């Protein structure tokens, strides 16, 4: 038995096919979803979506959004997403270094919050590349 997974951003469809299992980053922690999962709607956190195909795991960097699960259908609507295999590791590490520097020189509450978000996004992109199996 399989699940139909659809990952969407406001501009494009990132993924639309059948999968065996996913591990989804939510605001309350990661959840694993297998066929016949109980219906839920949940907020999606910045983090790594892990997708199991037959004998292979694929990663995707998600930048926050919402997910609806029910009747073996998973719809994930996110602000942005990238497949781990599409991310350039050197570019992602460069962005991470810039984000860390920006956090260190951030002044004021708003700049610190924005710098922390940018750092989380950058770390997620690097992690998506590094966890490809």
UniProtKB/Swiss-Prot annotation:
Family matches, as SUPFAM superfamilies: Epsilon subunit of F1F0-ATP synthase N-terminal domain (SSF51344)
A molecular function GO annotation: ATP binding
Record function comment: Produces ATP from ADP in the presence of a proton gradient across the membrane.
NCBIfam families found in the cross-reference section: ATP_synt_epsi
Gene: atpE
A Pfam family that the UniProt record links to this protein: ATP-synt_DE
GO cellular component: chloroplast thylakoid membrane; proton-transporting ATP synthase complex
Family (UniProt): Belongs to the ATPase epsilon chain family.
Principal subcellular localisation of the protein: plastid
Entry membrane topology: Peripheral membrane protein
Localization annotation: Plastid, Chloroplast thylakoid membrane
Subunit structure: F-type ATPases have 2 components, CF(1) - the catalytic core - and CF(0) - the membrane proton channel. CF(1) has five subunits: alpha(3), beta(3), gamma(1), delta(1), epsilon(1). CF(0) has three main subunits: a, b and c.
Name used for this protein in its record: ATP synthase epsilon chain, chloroplastic
UniProtKB keywords: ATP synthesis, CF(1), Chloroplast, Hydrogen ion transport, Ion transport, Membrane, Plastid, Thylakoid, Transport
Natural source organism: Piper cenocladum
